[in-house]
Swiss-Prot record:
Family the entry assigns: Belongs to the small GTPase superfamily. Rab family.
Lineage: Eukaryota, Metazoa, Chordata, Craniata, Vertebrata
Subunit organization: Interacts (GDP-bound) with C9orf72; C9orf72 acts as a GEF for RAB39A. Interacts (GTP-bound) with HOPS complex components VPS39 and VPS41, and STX17; interaction between HOPS components and RAB39A contributes to obtaining a functional HOPS complex that promotes membrane fusion driven by STX17-SNAP29-VAMP8. Interacts with BECN1. Probably associates with the PI3K (PI3KC3/PI3K-III/class III phosphatidylinositol 3-kinase) complex. Interacts with UACA. Interacts with isoform a of RASSF1. Does not interact with isoform c of RASSF1.
Native source organism of the sequence: Homo sapiens (Human)
Chain's gene name: RAB39A
Protein name: Ras-related protein Rab-39A
NCBIfam families listed in its UniProt record: small_GTP
Listed result of changing Q72L: Constitutively active (GTP-bound) mutant. No change in subcellular localization under autophagy-induced conditions
Entry function: The small GTPases Rab are key regulators of intracellular membrane trafficking, from the formation of transport vesicles to their fusion with membranes. Rabs cycle between an inactive GDP-bound form and an active GTP-bound form that is able to recruit to membranes different sets of downstream effectors directly responsible for vesicle formation, movement, tethering and fusion.
Amino acid sequence: METIWIYQFRLIVIGDSTVGKSCLLHRFTQGRFPGLRSPACDPTVGVDFFSRLLEIEPGKRIKLQLWDTAGQERFRSITRSYYRNSVGGFLVFDITNRRSFEHVKDWLEEAKMYVQPFRIVFLLVGHKCDLASQRQVTREEAEKLSADCGMKYIETSAKDATNVEESFTILTRDIYELIKKGEICIQDGWEGVKSGFVPNTVHSSEEAVKPRKECFC
């Protein structure tokens, strides 16, 4: 029997090169840390694609399309083309790299510019919290920035799996709640949110994916 999913969300992962975006995605989608010498942790060239189903409520699954973007400047033109069709994003910095934190606002402003006229929901992620002894960014600083920018904040580690599952769950649930409120809508020509596959026998979930007659976006 085919897997049931009520929505598909396209999420983008952005931030400076070497902050660990690819390792986070490997941990979330494959349940493992690829290791620093693995090609999986090499800087991304262009954009890589991952996917996974996430159950946010009993019997309600969201299909996540996850786009891992290159942090290097020479690939930014490729990255920008993916903003517009994303409903959510992980803004990742390395807590042991001050510069990556200082660039967060630049990434955010760029994303807001290219996502127009659609809405994108962000989660600020302080990665590599297993290296707390090498921390260059305090939790208080990161929490203040996230509050100023209207985002939630979480610290993660792909190496020991700290808060990896939680971070994807938080962002997915936030988007799902906004859809239920009518603040994010399925729209023709936009790939950010799509209705999912629901067998005819599952009437309760079927109702959840019917397009709204009104949209308050």
